Amino acid sequence: MATTADFKNGLVLKIDNKLQQIIEFQHVKPGKGPAFVRTKLKDVVSGKVTDKTFNAGVKVETATVDRRDMTYLYNDGSSYVVMDEKTFEQAELAPHIFGDAARFLLENTTVQVSFHEGEPLFAELPISLDLRIEHTDPGLQGDRSTGGTKPATLETGAEIQVPLFIETGNVVKVDTRDGSYLSRVNN
């Protein structure tokens, strides 16, 4: 059990026998009336995001979540195979466990997988990854000062928008949460 004072992003709550992960929360103390906590909760099974308000100080049941560092090995077509870095035990994860971030998975990437009662709930990639550009159109000399972007295909097959000065073969840092270009990595 936890109170609203214990809320933090990533905490998994058990509400109506469903596991809900806190994505965002805000403590509100209005000038009139009692304080409350406004939250955005994500159902860990369906991925549906809902808004819920809790009165301040209310006790809420939390789920015991075991987070483990695992290495992504390969995709066998229907699932992603990962290996526990401590026990070398392999597990097959359904595609929804990674969500949209799966498009940035590269072999031997360390991911953090969260389990509840032995069942995988969700997996998180590092916030940023260094990935090589497989293909992008060349930027024209006059285009470089405009600050525009162009599409580029990464070594994982994902497509992102990069600045015009990026060329095929460059290594770039990509934010895995939203797929945005962060910077060019010097080789």
From Swiss-Prot:
It is found in: Cytoplasm. Keywords: Cytoplasm, Elongation factor, Protein biosynthesis. CDD domains: S1_EF-P_repeat_1, S1_EF-P_repeat_2. One of its GO terms (molecular function) is translation elongation factor activity. Pathway: Protein biosynthesis; polypeptide chain elongation. The keyword Lipid metabolism does not apply. One of its GO terms (biological process) is peptide biosynthetic process. Gene3D superfamilies: 2.30.30.30, Nucleic acid-binding proteins. It comes from the Bacteria. Involved in peptide bond synthesis. Stimulates efficient translation and peptide-bond synthesis on native or reconstituted 70S ribosomes in vitro. Probably functions indirectly by altering the affinity of the ribosome for aminoacyl-tRNA, thus increasing their reactivity as acceptors for peptidyl transferase. Belongs to the elongation factor P family. This is Elongation factor P.
